[in-house]
Amino acid sequence: MSNYAPADPRASSNRYRYNGTCMTNPSERFDNLVGSDQSFEQLRRATFGEQPEEGIVLTTLDNAVNWIRKNSIWPMTFGLACCAIEMMSMGASRFDIARFGAEVFRPSPRQSDLMIIAGRVSQKMAPVIRHLYLQMPEPKWVISMGACATSGGVFNNYALVQGVNQYIPVDIYVPGCPPRPEQLIYAITLLQEKIQAERGSFRRALNLEPVTP
Protein backbone atom coordinates (compact mmCIF):
# COMPACT_ATOMS: atom_id res chain seq x y z
CA MET A 1 0.00 0.00 0.00
CA SER A 2 1.29 3.43 -0.91
CA ASN A 3 1.19 6.24 1.59
CA TYR A 4 0.10 9.76 0.75
CA ALA A 5 1.92 12.69 2.33
CA PRO A 6 -0.49 15.43 3.49
CA ALA A 7 -0.13 18.98 2.21
CA ASP A 8 0.70 20.31 5.68
CA PRO A 9 3.31 18.14 7.45
CA ARG A 10 3.28 20.34 10.55
CA ALA A 11 0.48 18.20 11.98
CA SER A 12 3.06 15.51 12.74
CA SER A 13 5.84 17.83 13.90
CA ASN A 14 5.65 16.48 17.46
CA ARG A 15 5.72 12.85 16.49
CA TYR A 16 9.49 12.57 16.72
CA ARG A 17 11.78 14.54 19.00
CA TYR A 18 15.27 14.46 17.52
CA ASN A 19 18.47 15.73 19.03
CA GLY A 20 20.91 15.60 16.14
CA THR A 21 20.34 12.10 14.81
CA CYS A 22 18.99 10.40 17.96
CA MET A 23 15.70 10.47 19.82
CA THR A 24 15.94 12.26 23.13
CA ASN A 25 13.91 9.65 25.04
CA PRO A 26 15.79 6.32 25.47
CA SER A 27 12.56 4.36 25.93
CA GLU A 28 11.25 5.71 22.60
CA ARG A 29 14.49 4.65 20.94
CA PHE A 30 14.14 1.19 22.48
CA ASP A 31 10.51 0.83 21.35
CA ASN A 32 11.51 1.93 17.86
CA LEU A 33 14.08 -0.86 17.69
CA VAL A 34 11.96 -3.71 18.93
CA GLY A 35 8.90 -2.77 16.88
CA SER A 36 5.34 -3.31 17.99
CA ASP A 37 5.13 -7.09 17.99
CA GLN A 38 3.31 -8.04 21.20
CA SER A 39 5.40 -11.15 21.84
CA PHE A 40 8.58 -9.08 22.01
CA GLU A 41 6.84 -6.52 24.20
CA GLN A 42 5.88 -9.28 26.63
CA LEU A 43 9.41 -10.70 26.55
CA ARG A 44 10.87 -7.28 27.21
CA ARG A 45 8.62 -6.66 30.21
CA ALA A 46 9.28 -10.15 31.60
CA THR A 47 13.04 -9.65 31.27
CA PHE A 48 13.59 -6.01 32.15
CA GLY A 49 10.33 -4.82 33.73
CA GLU A 50 8.81 -1.52 32.70
CA GLN A 51 12.16 0.14 31.98
CA PRO A 52 15.02 -1.72 30.24
CA GLU A 53 18.46 -1.60 31.77
CA GLU A 54 20.81 1.00 30.38
CA GLY A 55 22.68 -0.15 27.30
CA ILE A 56 20.57 -3.28 26.71
CA VAL A 57 18.40 -3.58 23.61
CA LEU A 58 16.13 -6.51 22.77
CA THR A 59 15.38 -6.83 19.08
CA THR A 60 15.29 -9.16 16.08
CA LEU A 61 17.55 -9.39 13.05
CA ASP A 62 14.72 -8.07 10.87
CA ASN A 63 14.24 -5.01 13.06
CA ALA A 64 17.99 -4.37 13.24
CA VAL A 65 18.36 -4.58 9.45
CA ASN A 66 15.34 -2.34 8.93
CA TRP A 67 16.63 0.18 11.47
CA ILE A 68 19.96 0.38 9.65
CA ARG A 69 18.32 0.71 6.24
CA LYS A 70 15.83 3.39 7.20
CA ASN A 71 18.59 5.56 8.69
CA SER A 72 20.95 5.23 5.72
CA ILE A 73 18.79 5.96 2.67
CA TRP A 74 20.83 6.97 -0.38
CA PRO A 75 18.73 8.92 -2.92
CA MET A 76 19.73 9.07 -6.56
CA THR A 77 20.90 12.39 -8.01
CA PHE A 78 17.98 12.63 -10.37
CA GLY A 79 15.64 15.51 -11.28
CA LEU A 80 13.22 16.07 -14.14
CA ALA A 81 11.66 19.54 -13.77
CA CYS A 82 10.61 22.23 -11.29
CA CYS A 83 10.21 19.94 -8.27
CA ALA A 84 13.90 19.09 -8.45
CA ILE A 85 14.69 22.62 -7.20
CA GLU A 86 12.76 21.90 -4.00
CA MET A 87 14.52 18.55 -3.73
CA MET A 88 17.89 20.32 -3.89
CA SER A 89 16.74 22.73 -1.18
CA MET A 90 16.03 19.72 1.01
CA GLY A 91 19.71 18.79 0.91
CA ALA A 92 20.92 22.29 1.86
CA SER A 93 21.70 23.59 5.35
CA ARG A 94 18.26 25.09 6.11
CA PHE A 95 16.35 21.80 5.89
CA ASP A 96 19.35 19.48 6.44
CA ILE A 97 18.21 16.06 5.28
CA ALA A 98 21.37 14.70 6.96
CA ARG A 99 19.32 14.59 10.19
CA PHE A 100 17.57 11.54 8.73
CA GLY A 101 20.64 9.82 7.30
CA ALA A 102 19.69 10.55 3.67
CA GLU A 103 22.25 13.21 2.73
CA VAL A 104 24.32 10.92 0.49
CA PHE A 105 22.99 11.58 -3.02
CA ARG A 106 24.57 9.10 -5.41
CA PRO A 107 25.11 9.74 -9.15
CA SER A 108 24.75 6.05 -10.01
CA PRO A 109 21.58 3.93 -9.71
CA ARG A 110 23.73 0.97 -8.67
CA GLN A 111 24.71 2.83 -5.49
CA SER A 112 21.22 4.20 -4.68
CA ASP A 113 18.18 2.76 -2.95
CA LEU A 114 15.75 5.68 -3.34
CA MET A 115 14.53 7.28 -6.56
CA ILE A 116 12.71 10.61 -6.20
CA ILE A 117 10.69 11.38 -9.33
CA ALA A 118 10.77 15.18 -9.14
CA GLY A 119 8.86 16.65 -12.09
CA ARG A 120 6.76 15.71 -15.10
CA VAL A 121 7.62 12.51 -16.95
CA SER A 122 7.59 12.60 -20.75
CA GLN A 123 6.84 9.58 -22.92
CA LYS A 124 10.47 9.56 -24.06
CA MET A 125 11.80 9.75 -20.51
CA ALA A 126 9.58 7.02 -19.05
CA PRO A 127 11.59 4.07 -20.50
CA VAL A 128 14.80 5.69 -19.21
CA ILE A 129 13.30 5.97 -15.72
CA ARG A 130 12.31 2.32 -15.78
CA HIS A 131 15.79 1.33 -16.96
CA LEU A 132 17.37 3.29 -14.10
CA TYR A 133 14.93 1.72 -11.65
CA LEU A 134 15.86 -1.79 -12.79
CA GLN A 135 19.56 -0.97 -12.29
CA MET A 136 19.02 -0.10 -8.63
CA PRO A 137 19.85 -2.94 -6.21
CA GLU A 138 17.28 -4.38 -3.81
CA PRO A 139 15.82 -3.15 -1.58
CA LYS A 140 14.75 0.03 -3.38
CA TRP A 141 12.00 2.58 -3.01
CA VAL A 142 10.37 5.34 -5.07
CA ILE A 143 8.87 8.70 -4.08
CA SER A 144 6.65 10.48 -6.60
CA MET A 145 7.16 14.19 -5.89
CA GLY A 146 4.62 16.70 -7.15
CA ALA A 147 1.36 16.67 -9.07
CA CYS A 148 3.02 16.20 -12.47
CA ALA A 149 4.88 13.01 -11.52
CA THR A 150 1.83 11.65 -9.71
CA SER A 151 -0.96 12.37 -12.21
CA GLY A 152 0.35 14.57 -15.02
CA GLY A 153 -0.64 17.77 -13.24
CA VAL A 154 -1.47 20.65 -15.58
CA PHE A 155 0.18 18.83 -18.49
CA ASN A 156 -2.72 16.66 -19.62
CA ASN A 157 -1.57 15.83 -23.14
CA TYR A 158 -0.22 13.02 -25.27
CA ALA A 159 3.45 13.86 -24.68
CA LEU A 160 3.47 13.27 -20.92
CA VAL A 161 2.84 10.22 -18.75
CA GLN A 162 -0.22 10.65 -16.55
CA GLY A 163 1.40 9.12 -13.49
CA VAL A 164 4.84 7.52 -13.18
CA ASN A 165 3.27 4.51 -11.44
CA GLN A 166 2.36 3.25 -14.90
CA TYR A 167 6.03 2.36 -15.39
CA ILE A 168 7.50 1.76 -11.92
CA PRO A 169 6.00 1.00 -8.49
CA VAL A 170 5.67 4.01 -6.19
CA ASP A 171 5.90 3.86 -2.39
CA ILE A 172 5.09 7.45 -1.38
CA TYR A 173 3.16 10.20 -3.18
CA VAL A 174 3.83 13.86 -2.33
CA PRO A 175 1.17 16.34 -3.59
CA GLY A 176 1.85 19.94 -4.55
CA CYS A 177 3.00 22.10 -7.45
CA PRO A 178 5.70 22.17 -6.36
CA PRO A 179 5.75 20.59 -2.88
CA ARG A 180 7.77 22.39 -0.25
CA PRO A 181 10.94 20.74 1.10
CA GLU A 182 9.14 20.10 4.40
CA GLN A 183 6.66 17.88 2.57
CA LEU A 184 9.43 15.84 0.99
CA ILE A 185 11.09 15.48 4.40
CA TYR A 186 7.78 14.24 5.79
CA ALA A 187 7.61 11.74 2.91
CA ILE A 188 11.08 10.51 3.92
CA THR A 189 9.83 9.91 7.48
CA LEU A 190 6.82 8.00 6.10
CA LEU A 191 9.17 5.87 4.03
CA GLN A 192 11.28 5.20 7.12
CA GLU A 193 8.18 3.95 8.94
CA LYS A 194 7.37 1.69 6.00
CA ILE A 195 10.92 0.29 5.94
CA GLN A 196 10.86 -0.36 9.70
CA ALA A 197 7.60 -2.31 9.36
CA GLU A 198 8.93 -4.69 6.68
CA ARG A 199 9.30 -8.37 7.55
CA GLY A 200 11.74 -10.93 6.18
CA SER A 201 14.46 -8.32 5.55
CA PHE A 202 17.27 -10.43 6.99
CA ARG A 203 16.36 -13.52 4.96
CA ARG A 204 16.16 -11.48 1.77
CA ALA A 205 19.51 -9.85 2.55
CA LEU A 206 21.05 -13.36 2.60
CA ASN A 207 19.14 -14.36 -0.57
CA LEU A 208 17.16 -16.93 1.38
CA GLU A 209 13.85 -15.65 0.01
CA PRO A 210 12.94 -14.64 -3.55
CA VAL A 211 12.53 -10.90 -4.12
CA THR A 212 9.36 -9.80 -5.88
CA PRO A 213 10.31 -7.70 -8.94
From Swiss-Prot:
NDH-1 shuttles electrons from NADH, via FMN and iron-sulfur (Fe-S) centers, to quinones in the respiratory chain. The immediate electron acceptor for the enzyme in this species is believed to be ubiquinone. Couples the redox reaction to proton translocation (for every two electrons transferred, four hydrogen ions are translocated across the cytoplasmic membrane), and thus conserves the redox energy in a proton gradient. SUPFAM superfamilies: HydA/Nqo6-like. This is NADH-quinone oxidoreductase subunit B 1. One of its GO terms (cellular component) is respiratory chain complex I. InterPro entries: NADH_UbQ_OxRdtase-like_20kDa (IPR006137), NADH_UQ_OxRdtase_20Kd_su (IPR006138). It is a peripheral membrane protein. It comes from Koribacter versatilis (strain Ellin345). Belongs to the complex I 20 kDa subunit family. It catalyses: a quinone + NADH + 5 H(+)(in) = a quinol + NAD(+) + 4 H(+)(out).
